[in-house]
């Protein structure tokens, strides 16, 4: 893997040796990308090229970056064994992801709060770590620069904009399971927004 030295900058120091060993066993091209609101990373099977490819967002903290890398590397191993004949996040992928993650958890690579949430998430890993509120919140504790707050943290009735889409001006409403009914003051329409969405509070200016 020709760009491992670039990858070293983004992962915890304690993980460098093991990640290097994984990449020697499973060569893949890794490309660091800009922020993508819809995903942290992805795996691309490129059978006509020498290496397959993994892309990972540049703005993740080291622990989020490492989890994303292992998530995508599990896709590589699943593809090598099954190509497109199994579900992307089915039992085969879960098996590889658990196997890859286990030594990093055992070697205390992650802080205690992240490790605790990660152990719960890894009991049955989902397609995205965003599906685990406790994991998302623990990982945010280690962000150097937070772009906003979580919708869960905003008081009911407050107004806000999304971090990645400033076109809407929402008022936070009632909660149903993991989402809030939010009213867009511009379009006068209602939307259901995840409590884990990153938002920026907005102070309303009231006319007299």
Where are these regions (language model features)?
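Metalloprotease/metallohydrolase-associated module, dominated by Zn2+-dependent proteases
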Residues: 2-48, 53, 59-62, 82-208
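Active-site recognition of the HExxH zinc-binding catalytic motif
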Residues: 67-80
């Amino acid at each position: 893997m020709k760009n491992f030295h670039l990858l070293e900058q983004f992962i915890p120091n304690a993980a460098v040796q093991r990640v290097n060993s994984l990449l020697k066993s499973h060569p893949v091209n890794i490309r660091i990308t800009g922020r993508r609101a819809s995903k942290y990373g992805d795996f691309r099977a490129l059978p006509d090229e020498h290496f397959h490819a993994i892309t990972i967002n540049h703005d993740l903290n080291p622990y989020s970056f490492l989890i994303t890398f292992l998530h995508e590397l599990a896709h590589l191993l699943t593809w090598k064994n099954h190509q497109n004949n199994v579900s992307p996040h089915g039992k085969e992928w879960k098996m590889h992801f658990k196997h890859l993650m286990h030594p990093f958890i055992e070697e205390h690579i992650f802080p205690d709060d992240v490790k605790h949430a990660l152990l719960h998430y890894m009991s049955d890993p989902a397609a995205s770590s965003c599906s685990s509120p406790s994991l998302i919140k623990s990982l945010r504790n280690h962000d150097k620069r937070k772009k906003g707050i979580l919708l869960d943290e905003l008081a009911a009735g407050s107004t806000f904009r999304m971090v990645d889409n400033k076109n809407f001006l929402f008022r936070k409403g009632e909660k149903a399971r993991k989402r809030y009914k939010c009213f867009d003051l511009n379009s006068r329409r209602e939307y259901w927004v995840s409590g884990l969405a990153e938002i920026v509070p907005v102070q309303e200016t009231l006319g007299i």
